[in-house]
């Protein structure tokens, strides 16, 4: 990929990018991709496609409930770095 900020164009990635932006906010997503190195950019693509383009697309849980579960899991695991962004996401989802 010659342009570091060019994103894959497949539907799963694009749906994941839209959901990730909806939940986490544009600034969070922009920062995640802007801060990615050549080594970590594939991981950002994977997270966007697998987590946000697959798991977060399922309609068995609404976004508010899914966010609250995520916050609870991250809290229990002591993952404070990830928790900060997901608390903002939960607030974006009405929690």
Each predicted region: which residue ranges?
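Acidic, glycine/proline-rich low-complexity segments that act as flexible tails and inter-domain linkers
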Residues: 1-65, 92
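Mid-chain, well-packed structural core segment of small domains
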Residues: 71, 76-95
């Amino acid at each position: 990929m010659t342009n570091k900020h060019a994103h894959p164009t497949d539907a799963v990635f694009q749906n994941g990018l839209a959901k990730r932006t909806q939940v986490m906010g544009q600034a969070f997503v922009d920062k995640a991709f802007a801060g990615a190195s050549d080594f970590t950019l594939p991981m950002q693509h994977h997270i966007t496609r697998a987590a946000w383009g697959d798991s977060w697309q399922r309609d068995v849980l609404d976004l508010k409930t899914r966010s609250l579960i995520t916050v609870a899991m991250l809290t229990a695991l002591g993952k404070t770095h990830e928790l900060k962004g997901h608390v903002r996401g939960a607030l974006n989802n009405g929690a």
